Amino acid sequence: IEPLIIVAVGNAGRDRIDEFTPTRDNMHDAGGLADRYGQMLVYEIKPWVDHSWRTRRTARDTAVAGSSLGGLLSLHLGLTHPAIFGKVGLLSPSVWWDDRWIVRQLATGGRRPDLRIWLDVGTGEARMLKGTRLLYRMLLRKGWRIGTDLHYMEADGALHDERAWGERAGLFLRFLFPAHP
């Protein structure tokens, strides 16, 4: 893997469901603050990181990644800020949110942005499998190509938890940031 800087942002505790979701989901009576969260990342945190460390500032050198609702948020941010985030890591993303809003967004969106995407899910995540597979098919339909700018993985028996995501972290980092010969 190529040398990189990882910046981890706390998950906001109780406000996580609001801050990590792009739309209000009336069924859950929550959500819809992802754009505000994205503004913080794009206009406060990333400039601070770029100022504080020696970074490569291009989108092709910058990723956003997350698991569960953080995966939903990361895809939304990649789609809405492709000039900032050129790589997206989606570990067990919450595709189910707001009746699969993110899949509908991709289906009706215009030109697909130039993003390199890692998408995975555990086969032990019964609730997540169907939506993640649907998202995978939509990404293919929109022009992403396996092995080039998309990697899809179903981790055998993996559950929806930090341990499972941690076990896949090296894999997704190697795909998004491969070592250059």
What are the residue ranges of the model-derived segments?
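Non-catalytic cap/lid and distal C-terminal segments of serine-dependent acyl enzymes
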Residues: 1-181
